Swiss-Prot record:
Name of the protein: Sorbin and SH3 domain-containing protein 1 homolog
Compositionally skewed regions (Low complexity) per UniProt: 270-279, 448-475
GO biological process, one term: maintenance of mitochondrion location
Organism this protein belongs to: Caenorhabditis elegans
Gene (name only): sorb-1
Residue ranges of domain SH3 in the record: 683-742, 745-805, 946-1005
GO cellular component: adherens junction; dense body; focal adhesion; plasma membrane
Keyword GTP-binding tagged: no
InterPro entries cross-referenced by the UniProt entry: Endophilin_SH3RF (IPR050384), SH3-like_dom_sf (IPR036028), SH3_domain (IPR001452), SoHo_dom (IPR003127)
Biased composition, class Basic and acidic residues, residue ranges: 544-557
Alphabetical list of CDD domains matching this protein: SH3_Sorbs_1, SH3_Sorbs_3
Amino acid sequence: MMHHPHPFGSNLANSSEPQQPSGQYLNPAADAYNFDTFEDSDKFSPKGNVAALRNVIHGQLDMKTPTGNSSRYQKPAPPPVDSTPSWAKNVKVYEPNGYVDPHLNKHNMGRVLDGPVNPNKYFQGVPPASYSQVKHNESKPPVPPSTKPPHSAAQALQAQVLQSSKAPSQPQQSQKTSYRIPYDVALDPRHHLGEFDIDDSASIISSCISTFGESSEIAGFSAAAEQRHLYEQYRKKLMEEKNELKEGSETPCVSLSEKVMTSSTENLKNGNNQQNQQPEPQPPSSSIFNSELTPFGHVAPVAKQFEPTNFPPFSPEKESEIKRSIDLESSQLLVKSKSPAPYSTSSTDHYGTIRRKHKPVAIDLSKSSPNLASQSPSNLFFGASFEEKQNRSPMTSTPSYKEQGFKNDSLNDSLNQAFEIASSIETTKNAYEAPPTPKSASHDRSISDTYPVSSSTTSTWPSHTTTPTTTTAAAPIAAVAPQTYTEQQPMSTSMSSSVMSTNMDEPIVVGSHQQIPQQSPDSSPERNEDMSQWYRKMFKQMHRKGEDGSNEGKEQHFINPSNVTDGIGRTTPTASNLGRSRENLSFNQHRPDHPSSYFDSLEHGPNDQYNNQERVKQSNEEELLRLKAEKLAEELRKEKERKHSFIPSSAPSLQNNMDRLNSLLYDFSSDIQEPAHRDYTPQPVMTATAVYKFEPRSARELPLNRGDIIRIIREVDGYWMEGERNGRSGIFPTSYVQINTGNQGDSQKMRAIYPFTARSDTELSLKRGEIITRRRQIDSNWLEGSNQIGIVGIFPASYVEPIEQVEQHIPTIVPNRPKTPKIEDQVYNQVYKPNETVIMQSNQGYYDKAAVVPNNKVRFDLPSGSDSNLQMSLNPHQNQFPPTHTQTSTQQPSNYGMKKIEYEREKVVEEVPPMHMDQYRKLNDEPKNPKKDTNILMNAASLIPKGSEMYRAVYPYQPQKEDELQLYTNDIIFVVEKCDDGWFIGTSLRTGDFGIFPGNYVKRH
């Protein structure tokens, strides 16, 4: 049911009659006449009836709207408010029910599954910048009424701060506290006097400030001023307490140098106070796991210690004078303004981190022995060994060796050493705890071998007798403790303090009331033998003799054992055991008065360094020579073991050529430049013919194919020669080639009288009438020779005949094979005459076709006679290749000095037009010898275009067009032009055809 407000003015405010429901008005017209039933007519003036009636009608109309939306007669209702922020609509995070302490559940807080993290709830460091910005001119919708507004995180934190200011109900708080405490103060008795609330509140304040910062809304709530006040109060309290600790002597916060130099009277008084109480016996801890660990920043709990029978009783300090640890790190972190809460092991905000638990150092400097002031603090903390003396800064005056371990260092040295030992030594129990059970030597082998320790009694035994007695051993012991003991507790050196983290469950206490245990069962003969070996090894290292074997001029060093103990569960040899070690080391030489060998060795340093440099330089040179010899030997071995992939049966073997590279190693590796070119007397060129195929194995070798002609440069040795082939020089085996006797032109020429077809690669095919150069005679039936294109092979001796004299006429017998290029007699007689030389001219500047040779033969155009410089003779002795140059038809005749080769595929004979024949004229009326012209025309080599390159077909190729050239394997092609698209233009020697062919099908020959 819907209740409307009073629309009839202020006169209806005190009306006691109940309003009738608006549902009784069925139509607006009835409301105008029956409004007196709704309210009494005498309670409002007639002047307001119209306005009241209008409001009633409007209300009824709004109620009857089918959509239920806001009408134009009243203000629209505010839109529903979405409680979920825009950034968290698609976010899934860990949200526990109710308020969650961020310190106890921080391992689950802010675990974002998808999307960002809400900075209002989850402490993820500094919130985004948009969180701290204030949006201006932003109208927020009215909040719907609620019974009780929920508490925000800021209010919850404020309530927590206000609640923490109250005094705790119990004097000691549990380990798991719900607040972030700088360091655990629950076990600190000084916080039981009403100081815990300040520490607790300051912890929360520092945590809030470090987490949110001043710019966040959390830091701006109403309790910010009180937080500042509490924090300042805590800092003031801390500074006052620090000043009190400096003035008093109950904590080691005072200057350590002043405590070290305390007078003996105060030490005696403090020592007498220890006789009041005596701790109850307690069994030693058997393992590091059952020992109670002390968190970093805690006060070491007072443990009851077992008292040996031979020790004088002593009493611990009172509760007010209990020793506290030096926690400089935590105090400095807390003093900083707005710094994060210092680390505490009691809080749970370190999940997922790995941090070594720190153990405080309990140092009692207020109750030192009377002889403590006379003993050097450096010896107390670092020992008097040789290594420790080198680590420290040199003193103003060098004491004698006997008094070195008992002299007082400077005040600065003692202060620095005290702070160093306070920051390096870590332990878990205080000085009143009983010593643990010593461990076996096998468990500490790594430490004992690297940092051996020994009894402080041995600090003086080098100057005494071989077997020290109890009387001599009691003197240095009395300097540390007021009692006389047979054996002193092992002391740790400064080096061994760095490895004490391995056994941190054992006590390390520096004070006048140190307990001296009995000899450990670990002091076995095997242990003594190990220590002797270590001392012997160190002695040899420090007294290394020179190369001459003498030890004169060098002072012997002795590693003075340390007199500071390390409580890592093992004991070292006693004075008697070290005495036996001294006998083994055989100290028979005189010991100097002071250990100055380290400084004396610096005087001889430059000479030794110079000698060392000379030795290193000499050894380096020898090493380089040795490496070079090994490299050469390895190369020789590889060359000796190398096998060729193709070795003919008749070829000599290279496997036994052991010394074929001896001279090569010196010739090719030497840096000596060859002399410049001189005027040598011309000598005939020596050539060789490759008989077998040779594949190179290095860049210095020259590849050879069978039949290659090599120009010999020099003879390397009896097995290798250096030569040149096709512009490439290199070495090759002598047994793979045959030396040509005499020049190439003087070789015997032979003519093939019968055609011969080769049946193997070693044979040479012959064509009838082909000129062959004879090389050698294989046997009575076979000869070896090369044809005019350089192919070498064997052929029957009966198929050729020697050429004794030059023919006097042009032969009429020509090879039957039409593939061999030649010139017909008719064409020759028509164009060329024996007694004259003709040229061809063209009015257009181009050469025209003078004749077409039938049967795909070659037509030659003689050079122009207009240029006398380009006239060529037909005498082969004057010009070896007169008509071999090929040019394109676009060149002008004045610049064209070579003949032109054209080919016709159609077998049609054309007559030369008269106009062209008239252009021929005589150049020379002198008769020429027709015999020489016949030799040139019949020589197939004369058909090779001048300037062309010879290629050999590697793959067969079938032409696809008319202008393409057919190729067979091993065909010889003379290439005259190379196109950019990879196609070559040339002439096939086998067919005489001219055309184009793919360039990747041929190889340079």
